[in-house]
Amino acid sequence: MSGVAGSNLFRLEEATIDELHQAIKDGRTTCLAVVRHYIDRVRAFNGVASALVTQDGAAVPEATGTVRAMAPLRFPSQTVKASDVLPHLDKYKGPPLEFGRMEPTASDPEVQQQFGMVVGIPNAGQVNALATLNIRGERSVTCRGEFDRHPSLGPLPPAAPPVCEYFRHFPDALDRAAELDSTYGRNPDFEAMPMFGVVFSFKDPFDTKDMRSTGGGDARYDIDFPARDHVLVEQLRRKGAIIFAKAVNTEYNGRAGDPGGRHKPAKVLPSTLGYQRSTWGGNPSNPYDTRRSASLGSSSGSALSVSINLVMASLGEETRASCRGPANHNAVALILPHKSMLGFDGGAIGADIYCDRSGIHARTIGDCAKILDALKDPVAGYYDPRDPFTTVPRSSVLSSGYATHAKASGAPGTLEGMRLGIIRESMVYPMGSKTEEPIVTAAEREIKDILGGRLGAALVESSDPRWQRDPDLEQMATDFRGALAKLVPVFMPDLLFRLGRDGLPVFKEFAAAIVPTEFAPGKVFGSGTMQPIDYCVALAEGRTSPPSNLDLATIQQQELANTFRFHIAQYLMRRAADWKAQGFTETLADWPALNARSKFWGDDQRAAFENWEEVSDPRNTLGGRQGVNERIMLRELLRRVDMMVILENKLDALVRLHTPWPPGLIGGAYQYDIVSNLRPESLSGPNAGLTEILIPAGYVTTVYDPVFSLSKDATRYVSAPSHTPTSIPEPGLPFSLVFRAEPGKEDVLLKIASAYESASKRRIPPPVFGPLPMQSSAASS
């Protein structure tokens, strides 16, 4: 994209917000040129990246999907034979498998999408990051084609729904870019509009009044765009941003689980690994290896679209992994503010309102911080009256703003005098396992060499029975296991009485120490002499050894709460009411209508949604574990645990490895049969709702992927470890470090994270998705 000859060429790929603004001021680019450039990249790289897995591997008829970037999607006709993915398929005796197939969508029966089993296509050259582009004629199914005719081109066709007359007056991304150029030229007020010309994608659950918004779901709304923007989208519009696209995501923010009930799937999927997938938008692929998962969380397309330069920045949502996982897998920066400094559930489809929160993806932490500042309303601040979780203490929001703290250099000694606690629990793994070894080895070296060696921070490590202590590092006086022993008896004694899936006590040493006691209705355990309350006193005072598995990983499991039933009903009610206030009718306004007018890529979700529809009580079964209560208690406990570790070790912040596992193969075997490859320890920050900042930390070129094995009874496929290495072309597969501290200490976190980013410079753009031919630089007007 070029404006003037010679050294003044502006390269849009990998550009920062400041570099974009300088190029606009210099006349080296325009907003319209930037949007056109991104559209060209979308057309080149945003196609289908997955292939169907069919029973016989036979080709399927050619099929087309919805229009994106002015051309319809085209699906591959070649399929993968299921027996090439699943060993001993001829001996399988379990429930019927849901093989891959093409079907019309519910939203638009004239277009098709992939359903059932898929795998990533090797060297696809495509990633499928964006589901909807804000381009006139394709940004809505309700008002598609000529029903979105520009007002200057005359009246709409007679068959157009009445709401389309209202809708077509919203400028699309090209219109808005041209409007910004004509109004402000080379001299916009960047203080009043700090996001001027910055092109954003949004995880689909964020409501955008000028684009289809369905949470990624294939649901046939009367009006598939909402009547109002999400409050964060509204703020970005006001600050000059270009609302460009809705990103592919795991629909309904990770599908929300199954509350149980009478509805069962007719067919099952042997794995959903790498299915960060939308029935409407399809499945994304990793830009460093398109056979692999684009994320370990549902905001896949948000980070992916940033990583391959389809947009400059994106807003995602995290329940328990949905922003950090995508940032990790795509080597981009993330700031995930504490729950809930930034609103989410007030104008979005969530999954678990007690954990859902908004996060910011960009290629640098400095840009993330600039965006965080821009999201603040000059009067209301970050408060959203539609989201009760934004009632956070005012002292937890920095009065100085955030971008000013994200400017640390990577010079030697920048972090001298600061103390960082290493969460070794994030790096431990079973003895003899190979799958974690490459990333853990690299991350251990990165922390020690860069954070400690170059930047000068004092490193203090926690302990774990599976971790061999580093003799060069200080050991925590009180670590996470010690803090849990002191705090569980006070803040969440219920944990000690928890039963596992086998119906037996999770904490066996506790059961062995106490007298026979009812752990749950009709479930009595205990073979010792202590009263449970006296055991709690002894545990808190250090008079008895804690259970060997009382650790960060074991305590994260929670009962599924019934709040998804509440939240979706509330969202649909509000959306219909907003349209009624505008004089239009939306009849998809409750659970029965949603289920009657939806399709799902997996039949397990169809059954789950029908079960959700029949949930009638906000409480879980009386006498059993209560999901809402557990979320509130666990948040309090985990925040106190972090603070005890920080205070008793005089730490400034904590650092952890996001995950020791590389991006998994799409449709492949899980690690240790852990669904979605979510390590329990990694859930601590989300369950606590604490601010976390993620920075790319490097790449590995050797991985050990688990493989499928048929269970002994031949009724299901399970994971088996592999010691066979797979070589990945340079630069390899990414991994990231995560920095964490309490609310109100984001200034410290940003200093540490920006210093590390500046010193390490680990991000490498995905090589396959570089500048387009004849577009090595970004054109001005």
Predicted segments with their positions:
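Second-shell loop/turn segments in exported
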Residues: G6-S7, E19-D26, P158-R168, A219-I223, ...
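Structural helix-boundary/capping segments
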Residues: K25, V35, A44, S307-K434, ...
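Short, surface-exposed loop/helix-turn segments at secondary-structure junctions
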Residues: H263, G627, P663-R679, D705-S719
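Loop/turn elements at helix/coil->beta-strand transitions in domains of secreted/extracellular proteins
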Residues: I17, T30-L32, F190-E191, F196-V198, ...
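Short helix-loop capping/hinge segments that flank enzyme active sites or metal/cofactor-binding pockets
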Residues: G3-N8, A124-V127, L133-A159, M195-D218, ...
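Short glycine/serine-rich loop/turn segments
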Residues: G120-A160, A192-D356, P385-T391, I423-E425, ...
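Short, well-ordered alpha-helical
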Residues: S2-D222, N249-R255, R386-V397, A406, ...
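Acidic-enriched catalytic cores of C-N bond-cleaving enzymes acting on peptides and small amides
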Residues: I39, R43, S50, A63-Q113, ...
